C-alpha cells in the first residue's frame, strides 16, 4: 500500500480546490413567494376580491367553484342578515331626526347591503332549487322579521325599498305555499304567524295571507287526501311546523327585479 507524504497530500488538495474554482457557480435568482405562501399571508377580504376578479375574467371558473364550495347553512344566512341589520342601526348619526333625509343618506350604504343580501339569499330557499317546505318557511320567516326592522323615513321615496321588499316576500310566500297543492301530506298551516306578519307590514302581505286562508278553507279536502295517502303509506307522518313565512311576487322570481331599486 502506497504511503503519501505530507507534500503529496497538500498538492492533491490544491489541485482539487483549483478544479472547484473553475466550475460555474449557480447563484440564486430573486423571485416572488410561492402561491401557497401568498395565500397564507393574505387576509380574507383580499382573497375574496381576488377570487371575484378571477371569476369575472374566467366565467367558467364560477361553475367549478360552486361545485367545490359548500352552501352556507340556514343559521349562517340568518346570522349574516342580523349582523347587517345591526351594522345598519349602528350607522345612524347621533342625535337629530332619524327619519330625515340626512339620516337616510348616512345609512343608505348599510341599508342597501341588507337588501342585496336578501336579494341573494331568498331565491336559495324557493323551489325548484329548494324543495323542503319547512326549511323554506323557516328562512322566509326570519327574512320577514329582518324587513320588519328596516327603518322608515319621512320622505316616501326612501320607503320604496322596504315596500318592494315586502312585495317580493309576499311572492316568495306564495311560491312556497303552492308547494302544498301537490303534497299528499300537508304540514300545520302557520296562519297566526302570517297574520302577525301582515299586521306588522301594514297589510302589505295580504295577498299571501288570503292565499293561506283559502288553503285552510280547503283543509278538510286536504286532510282527506292525506288520510288516504297514509293508509297506503303508513310509515309517513304529518310534518308539524310552527314557524312563519314570507317573500316574493306571483312567480317567485321577483327578487331579480330588486336590482332596479338597489
From Swiss-Prot:
Gene3D superfamilies: Tethering factor for nuclear proteasome Cut8/Sts1 (1.20.58.1590). The keyword Acetylation does not apply. Disulfide bonds: none annotated. One of its GO terms (cellular component) is nucleus. It comes from the Eukaryota. It is found in: Nucleus envelope. It holds the Pfam family Cut8. One of its GO terms (biological process) is nuclear protein quality control by the ubiquitin-proteasome system. The N-terminal part (residues 1 to 72) is polyubiquitinated by rhp6, which is required for the interaction with the proteasome. Its main location: nucleus. InterPro entries: Cut8/Sts1_fam, Cut8/Sts1_sf. Keywords: Nucleus, Ubl conjugation. GO terms for molecular function: identical protein binding; proteasome binding; sterol binding. Binds the proteasome. Belongs to the cut8/STS1 family. Together with nucleoporin alm1, tethers the proteasome to the nuclear envelope. Involved in ubiquitin-mediated protein degradation and facilitates the degradation of nuclear proteins like mitotic cyclin and cut2. Required for normal progression of anaphase. This is Tethering factor for nuclear proteasome cut8. The gene is cut8.
Amino acid at each position: 500500500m502506497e504511503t503519501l507524504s505530507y507534500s503529496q497530500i497538500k498538492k492533491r488538495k490544491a489541485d482539487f480546490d483549483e478544479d472547484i474554482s473553475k466550475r460555474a457557480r449557480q447563484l440564486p435568482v430573486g423571485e416572488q413567494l410561492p402561491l401557497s405562501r401568498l395565500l397564507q399571508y393574505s387576509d380574507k377580504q383580499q382573497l375574496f376580491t381576488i377570487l371575484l376578479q378571477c371569476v369575472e375574467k374566467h366565467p367558467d371558473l364560477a361553475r367549478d367553484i360552486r361545485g367545490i364550495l359548500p352552501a352556507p347553512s340556514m343559521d349562517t344566512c340568518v346570522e349574516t342578515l342580523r349582523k347587517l341589520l345591526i351594522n345598519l342601526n349602528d350607522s345612524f348619526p347621533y342625535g337629530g331626526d332619524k327619519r330625515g333625509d340626512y339620516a337616510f343618506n348616512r345609512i343608505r350604504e348599510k341599508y342597501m347591503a341588507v337588501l342585496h343580501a336578501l336579494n341573494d339569499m331568498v331565491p336559495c330557499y324557493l323551489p325548484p332549487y329548494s324543495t323542503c317546505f319547512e326549511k323554506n318557511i323557516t328562512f322566509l320567516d326570519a327574512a320577514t322579521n329582518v324587513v320588519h326592522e328596516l327603518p322608515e323615513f319621512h320622505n316616501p321615496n326612501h320607503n320604496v325599498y322596504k315596500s318592494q321588499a315586502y312585495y317580493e316576500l309576499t311572492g316568495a310566500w306564495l311560491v312556497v305555499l303552492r308547494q302544498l297543492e301537490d303534497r299528499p301530506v300537508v304540514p300545520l298551516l302557520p296562519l297566526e304567524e302570517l297574520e302577525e306578519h301582515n299586521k306588522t307590514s301594514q297589510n302589505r302581505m295580504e295577498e299571501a295571507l288570503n292565499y293561506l286562508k283559502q288553503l285552510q278553507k280547503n283543509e278538510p279536502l286536504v286532510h282527506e287526501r292525506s288520510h288516504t295517502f297514509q293508509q297506503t303509506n303508513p310509515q309517513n307522518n304529518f310534518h308539524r311546523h310552527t314557524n312563519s313565512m314570507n317573500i316574493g311576487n306571483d312567480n317567485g322570481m321577483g327578487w331579480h327585479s330588486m336590482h332596479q331599486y338597489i
